[in-house]
Regions:
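Mixed-charge (Asp/Glu-Lys/Arg
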Residues: 1-179
Length: 180
């Protein structure tokens, strides 16, 4: 059962347009903290702190998880209307100027809060761009929602903080819980 859908994420980002640039990193940071129990470094500025120069996020994870590779990773977030343009621009910028990061030892994540709807699939895009990095991953709204739905605490935080008017109905073995 999906509590959180891609359409909900896209709507949240469009309704919270001014906040979305800082909200997307906060969501991903909370997901990383929730999923990764063996982090040795986490820097993902969010909210008002997103204007710091450099990568949007740097993570060192000692144990591989479903969504975060083992080792060092760098993260770029984009809330622009053209996700592909943003991803291509960030990839080119960081590949040309990696800011001291050893690309062959680093996984590069590009995150956008919209469903990927381009002729080239994310898998094809990743395959075409992974030569210079240890690995490259594109996380779109679909991947983010799968991750959110695997982390109920983060999902509940978003719904309580930003989607309080969303109808949620959860059936459990013991009882039905509803909110309108």
């Amino acid at each position: 059962m999906k509590l959180f859908t891609s359409k909900m994420l896209e709507r949240l980002m469009s309704e919270q347009k001014k906040k979305s640039e800082g909200l997307l990193p906060e969501i991903v940071k909370r997901l990383i903290q929730s999923k990764c129990s063996d982090l040795s470094y986490l820097r993902v500025p969010d909210g008002d702190d997103i204007w710091a120069p450099g990568y949007d996020g740097i993570v060192v994870n000692e144990t591989k998880t479903t969504y975060v590779a083992q080792g060092k990773s760098v993260w770029e977030f984009g809330t622009n209307s053209d996700s592909l343009e943003k991803i291509n621009g960030d990839y080119k910028k960081r590949t040309t100027h990696p800011l001291g990061v050893e690309k062959s030892d680093t996984t590069f994540y590009l995150v956008v809060p919209k469903v990927w709807a381009y002729r080239i699939s994310t898998t094809e895009w990743e395959a075409e761009h992974r030569e210079e990095w240890k690995a490259v991953h594109v996380y779109d709204a679909s991947v983010l929602c799968d991750w959110l739905n695997s982390e109920p605490a983060v999902c509940a935080w978003i719904m309580q903080s930003y989607l309080e008017n969303e109808l949620i109905k959860i059936d459990t073995v013991d009882r039905e819980i509803g909110r309108a």
